[in-house]
Swiss-Prot record:
Name of the molecule in the record: tRNA (adenine(58)-N(1))-methyltransferase catalytic subunit TRM61
EC number(s) stated in the UniProt entry for this protein: 2.1.1.220
Keywords: Methyltransferase, Nucleus, S-adenosyl-L-methionine, Transferase, tRNA processing
Stretches the record annotates as Disordered: 281-323, 385-406
Group of enzyme by EC: transferase
Subunit and partners: Heterotetramer; composed of two copies of TRM6 and two copies of TRM61.
InterPro entries: SAM-dependent_MTases_sf, TRM61_C, tRNA_MeTrfase_Gcd14
Stretches with biased composition (Polar residues): 394-406
GO CC annotation terms, alphabetical: nucleus; tRNA (m1A) methyltransferase complex
Amino acid sequence: MSYFTEYKDLIAEGDLVLVWISRGNVKQLRIKSGEVFNTRYGSFAHDDIVGRPYGSQIGVRTKGSNRFGFIHVLQPTPELWTLSLPHRTQIVYTPDSSYIMQRLGCSPQSRVIEAGTGSGSFSHAFARTVGQLFSYEFHHMRYEQALAEFQEHGLIADGNVTITHRDVCQKGFLIKAGDTTSYEFLEGQDSVSVNADCIFLDLPAPWEAIPHLDAVIAKDRTARLCCFSPCIEQVDKTLEALELHGWEEIETVEIQGRQYESRRQMVRQLDDALERLRDVKRRKQHGTERRKRLGEQLGSVEELTDDVRPKTPKTSYNPFGKGSRVKEGDNGFEWKQVAKVESEIKSHTSYLTFASKILFKSRDENTVSQLLEQYKDFNPNVKAASKLDKRPQETSFEESQASNSV
């Protein structure tokens, strides 16, 4: 079972979990009986975690005090794994990966090529969404680390991921028997049919890998490509290679994110402001009178003590929350929804270059005839063609105007 593609309700011994300690501090943990997970907020026994639902808050009393520390135990997801994984290379974060998968049209039927496995962040997101992932890594040590990680997470044997040690810029994407790969060849099988319709290139020189793609992309449907390039000079060379090898719909974008902070703000009416001014004036007048009485030093010591702190009833009027703690959304006040945007835009991670390609454009005769019949129902002026060579005749502008007027 893969912890990243399947879900369960309760935590069991041997599960891989992600422990949310604080914002930006997420740790991976393998649950083992008898062991203890130590943090600055306390020590948490694994036995106390087993059997609890995923997402539970686990609390312990801090030694030597009455304070409690707690953690949250979460089910692994690609988004949370991105926050906790060991960085072997620069990774693709969720704002970029989610947009890339949407632009590539990834689905459970997709067959994806990922060149540049790196730390495996994007590989986990692909594995959850697509039907088959072929990932390539040229650095042997990173390949071995990623392979061990994918096997531990159940993405190889029980999953849909194949990782290969290969320099795709020099040797291409074909996987053959004898290559260093996680793919298990059947008896008599000498190669793998990649047949990919989505390609993601996270390479220093993607323009060197583009010429090798025609041998492995799908022949019967559109293939979509994304190149992840930090420098604009890389983008320039990539565009030249895409145009040279027949790729179309070429576009380069960058993702820049700004966070909107939404909250409720107290509505301050004019009448409330006037009443507040009157209240301040009354308090000021009361203070002046009290100081005057103290200055005259009238009465006994006990009377002076009483005058220093006069017992006046606590006022219940507080239009702006002054003098008492008011929680956001308190029913005693009127609120409105407001939002504040970050003043600075977070800088981009890389340029994203998208393109698409169809190797062979073929149409089925029956499909075309059905489409023409459907179109005829909406436009009676078009005659349906029974064969591909029978196209609706073209008409001049004057003839079309005359037919429309009739």
